[in-house]
Structure formats: C-alpha cells, structure tokens
Amino acid sequence: MSTPRILFDVDDPDTGLAFLTVNRPEARNAMTSDMYQALVEACERVDADAAIRVFVLRGAGGQAFMSGTDIAQFTRFSTREDALAYERELDAVVDRLERVTKPTIAQVQGVATGGGCAIALACDLRVCTPDARFGVPVARTLGNCLSAANYARLLDLLGPARTKDLMFTGRLIDAAEAQTLGLVNRIVDADAIDAAVRELAATIARNAPLTLRATKEMVRRLQAARRIPQAEADDLIAMCYLSDDFKEGVAAFLAKRPPTFKGR
C-alpha cells in the first residue's frame, strides 16, 4: 500500500486509526498522478478494513500539508481534453476521499494550497498549526480555475462572498482567519499537534461506527444535492486552461517570475 511518497500506516487494531503521510517535503508535498492514485488506493483500504475507524491525512516536513499538483505536468496541456481529463482525475480523487465511510481528519502544518486545499476541504475535520495557510491562488499564479465540485466545497464552508474574496484576491488565509471562517476546527501548536490529532481521532474511534457513518453520509448527500454536474462547467474549464494566460502562468511559475496576464 505504501510508496516512497505516500506512506500508509495502520495503528494497532485496538486503536482503530490509520494514517496517510504525503512524503515529498523537498517539493512542499506537491502531488503527482501516481501519488493521487496511491491516495485513492489508501481510501479503498480504509473502507475495506473494519478495524479502521478514523483516517488521518498529513504532510511530511512540517512546511506543507500538500501544495497541490506538480505544476510541471501542465506544460504538456494542449487540448480541451487535456484540461477536462485533469480536472476529472482530480475530482475523482477528491470525491473518493470525500466518500470514505469513516471520519477523516486533515492534519495541516504549513501550506494547503490548490489541490492540497481541495483535499483538506474534502476531509471531515481540519486541525492545523498556527503557521498553516489555506487557499487556491490561481488568479495570481496560473490563471486556471477549479472544478464545479471544488468551488462547491469552498461555498459549503465559506459562503459565496468569502469564496469570491479568496478566489478573486488569490490570497492565502492564515490559521486564525480560517478558524474564524469555519474552515478549521482546531489550532494546535506544532509540538503538540501529533498528540492532539491522535487524541481527537481516538475519541471519535470510540463512538458508534454506524452513527458516524450515517452522519457523514447524510451531510454529504445534503451538500451533493446542491452541486451541478461537472459537464455544465466544462466551458469554463476549457476557457481557462486553453488560454494564453494559463500558458503564461505556468511558464512564469516554473521560471519563478511574476506572470503578466492579458485576459486572453
């Protein structure tokens, strides 16, 4: 189950806890297609193992939970299908995590941006350190956009005005603001977060599994009822990903310079 970049570990069966650690700290835990697939496989394992009661996701190195998708792969995008296939792949991964039948906790240290932010939002609870930052800064970096489902996750937690604020400005919100907005459940100092998350997970794991499952699935169904099919947003995905601005954003990011966007 584990790979060098995705470490999956199940505690002693008596605890009921499973942990996934994204282990690519040299790249701020940026995700590749293989890493996304390993996350899906971990979700399958969690659902298949009755001894697992709670699933915790975290990033190695202390500087990033996950910083999203490895930007280098975007240099290969040239067609509408490239863009749609990428967003559908990411949607499938995040949706699979969201559908895990056991409670999930994102343990966030450092940044959770782009796809990493989407993964954190797909978890049931988020516990972070004071230095954590959340956001999807594509308006000032790459010039692309999110899938309908990932916009919906932001809307569920932040509401329309705050979602637009976050996306329009491209800013990252710190831990204190994230907690005020309801995005984060708890803030814990870095030297105590492992123990705090383990204690929270153990508390949940002692409770009635069917009640936990029913609560999680009921909330998911209620939220899903407000979402549109991704196909209804394909025109917006293609508009952004096939633009000159997106090509400029990717080139600028890889060259470590500010992008110059022209709206075309």
Which residues does each PLM region occupy?
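Short, active-site-adjacent cap segments at secondary-structure transitions
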Residues: 62-66, 112-114, 135, 219
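CoA-thioester-processing core
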Residues: 93, 97, 107, 113-166, ...
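C-terminal long alpha-helix characteristic of the crotonase
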Residues: 25, 127-132, 184-231, 238, ...
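Glycine- (often His-adjacent) and acidic-residue-rich active-site loop
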Residues: 40, 59-95, 140-143, 225
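Well-ordered beta-strand positions
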Residues: 125, 165, 169-171, 177, ...
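Conserved CoA-thioester-binding segment of acyl-CoA-metabolizing enzymes
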Residues: 1-58, 95
